Structure formats: C-alpha cells, structure tokens
Amino acid sequence: VVGKPIGEGRIYRHGEAFPENQEVEDPQYIDGGIFRYHPIKDRFEVVAHGFSNPWGMDFDDNGQIFISACVIPHLWHVVPGGIYHRQGGSHVNPYVYSDIQTITNHRHRSAHGGARIYLADALPERYHNRIFMANIHEHALLTDILEPKGSGFIGHHGDDAVLANDGQWIGFSIEIGPDGAVYILDWHDPDICGIDVFEKDTGRIYRVAPPGHSGKAGINLAKLSDEELVDLQHHR
C-alpha cells in the first residue's frame, strides 16, 4: 500500500519490507507499477500497474511515457490507468481480460537497466528520439527506434551503441548530460543478479560522445538572457 504520507512523513520511508501499517492518507494498493506525487497540489496517484523491475522510465518530447523492464520483454509505451504485462502473480484488477504487452517487434537478452530518450543534438541526427537502454546481461548499451503507430508506438531494434568486451561491465543507469553526451553508470561486478556485492570500489561512469565533442564549460547561467538560455539547449 502506498499513498500520501501523514504529517511530516516522507514519500519513501525506511522500515519493514512489507509493513502492515503505512500511515498514509488515501492508501492505494500497488504490486508493481508506477506512481506519482504532485508536491504543489499535494496529490498522490497510481499511474499504471504491472511490469517487472521497471528500472528505466523517460518521456519523449510530447510527454509520452516509455519504460524498460527486467526479465520480461523490455519496452512499453505507458498510458495512465493501464494494466501491463507482469513477471508473475496476479493483477491488481482480477477482471482484466488481457494486459498490455510490449511495443517491441524484437527481443533483447534478459534484463535492462535505465532508459533515456535522446532529445539532445550532440550525437548524429539519426539518434534523436531513440531510446537508450543498458542491458546488464549483454554488457551493452542498446537503442530502440520509436515509431508512432495509431494511438501507440512500435519499438524497432536500433544500433548496439556500446558492446563491452568485459563480462563484469554492468551498465545500469543512463543520463543525458548538459553537453548532449550519454553517460552510463557501470556498477562493474561479477555477480549480476545476486545479493552479494563483491566489488564495492570498481564502479565507473562512461561518457559516449562524438570525437572531439567537449560541450561548454564555465557558463554563469544567472547572467544569461532568456534567448541565450534557450540556445544552450543546442549541444553542437
């Protein structure tokens, strides 16, 4: 059960794995899925149910939600209120006729971590609006091409942007930097799915960018005009 914290509580609270009492207002049951909280309107709601370890979520330039997942097929276009494919167990609504399946027309291996839709312009134009995902079992950074179709999308296999030759390379989180480069967190450990962390000091961050691309440094944003701030959205 999750919901808006009572009193001075926080959205995320440390405690039991399955606490019996959450002390929240308007509690809502969720067993896998996405929820959101509006800090200004003080409103809490479940967005969608389902998935399996959805470790990556991002928005395209029209505000559409896309999510990656672990073990089950790897990519979904998320519609608020939807009930989606889950790894196991029962859906929150027992009367669901059929859940919403992946938008992809292909499969990658096993688990994905992280998801970012590339809306910058430092990389070649063909990467614009592609979704970048790390695959922890393939030791790779993969891309899918998002093609609009009807009211949804199809995910086509794009470039394998990075293929590591290291069995301990575990890309897990992705960010698009202010310079337009793609940054990948590599937790670098031989145990991919276990609970033991053997190497606690070997994690690394990789930067993927065109040769010679350094971005802009030493900028005082407070001194820039609105037009100059807008121009900084371009990374070339």
Provide a role label for each language-model segment.
Residues V1-D231, H235:
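Beta-propeller blade termini and top-face loops
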